[in-house]
């Protein structure tokens, strides 16, 4: 006999499927529509940069700290980027205290890869003395509330925090504080596949019933900087190209809104 939770899950999945047949979603959005997006910057006074993103009911807080350290042996004239993501227990009953979960590590890698592969930060300008001293950039991502699509909210919050980051030169006697040298604004867009449909910004309910999720991080020139698939069901070649087109188009829209929001916050 099925448990009540399994029965509810089946009914919810059937409900979402039936809506999709009519080209509708649970919250009334179209398949290419994001939920309401809100950006706040400089929300942590002791951080070098910070931002909070609210995507629907999903909330993510990012703080950026810089400290000096030694470079890696194979990149002695480049700074270091370290990204951590924490699934706080207050964000969801599914998130428990303890060591980082595998999915948290995976999501941190997606955020980190998008920043690195797009060349978002000019890491050579983080070099203080070649082979001896560089700035290490710590990007700490905290999930405050999970209502779906944590990765996109995390990517957006991380970039917004970096774009408001000041390098604390004065602390090290290196002159005046300067803005972190940014070269690019990558945007991550996650699509969920349910049946034959692809939709951006899946809610928590949509994530629970989707067969596969695909996150695509793109740069301002439309090039793909990173891609991560989650879920057992494969995508056809046609679905993959459709997903890339949708992601690049949506990223351009989000990027424009973000730059406008950042300009207003200065």
UniProtKB/Swiss-Prot annotation:
GO cellular component: cytoplasmic exosome (RNase complex)
Main localization of the protein described in the UniProt heading: cytoplasm
Subcellular location: Cytoplasm
Record has Secreted as a keyword: no
Keywords: Cytoplasm, Exosome
GO process annotations (BP): rRNA catabolic process
NCBIfam families: PRK04282.1-1 (NF003282)
The protein's name: Exosome complex component Rrp42
Gene name of this polypeptide: rrp42
């Amino acid at each position: 006999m099925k448990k009540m939770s399994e029965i509810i899950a089946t009914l919810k999945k059937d409900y979402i499927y039936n809506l999709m047949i009519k080209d509708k979603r649970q919250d009334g959005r179209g398949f290419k529509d994001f939920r309401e997006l809100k950006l706040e910057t400089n929300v942590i006074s002791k951080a070098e940069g910070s931002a909070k993103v609210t995507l629907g009911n999903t909330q993510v807080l990012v703080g950026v700290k810089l400290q000096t350290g030694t470079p890696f042996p194979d990149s002695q004239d480049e700074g270091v980027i370290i990204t951590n993501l924490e699934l706080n227990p207050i964000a969801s009953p599914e998130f428990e205290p303890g060591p980082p979960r595998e999915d948290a590590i995976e999501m941190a890698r997606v955020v980190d890869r998008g920043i690195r592969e797009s060349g978002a930060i000019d890491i050579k300008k983080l070099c203080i003395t070649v082979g001896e001293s560089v700035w290490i950039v710590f990007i700490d991502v905290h999930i405050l509330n999970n209502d779906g699509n944590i990765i996109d909210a995390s990517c957006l919050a991380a970039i917004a925090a970096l774009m408001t980051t000041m390098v604390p030169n004065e602390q090290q006697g290196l002159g005046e504080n300067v803005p972190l040298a940014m070269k690019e604004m990558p945007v991550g867009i996650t699509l969920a596949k349910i049946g034959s449909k692809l939709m951006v910004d899946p809610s928590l309910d949509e994530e629970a019933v989707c067969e596969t999720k695909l996150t695509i991080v793109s740069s301002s020139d439309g090039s793909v900087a990173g891609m991560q698939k989650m879920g057992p069901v494969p995508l056809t070649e046609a679905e993959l190209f459709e997903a890339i087109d949708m992601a690049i188009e949506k990223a351009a829209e989000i990027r424009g809104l973000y730059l406008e929001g950042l300009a207003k916050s200065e």
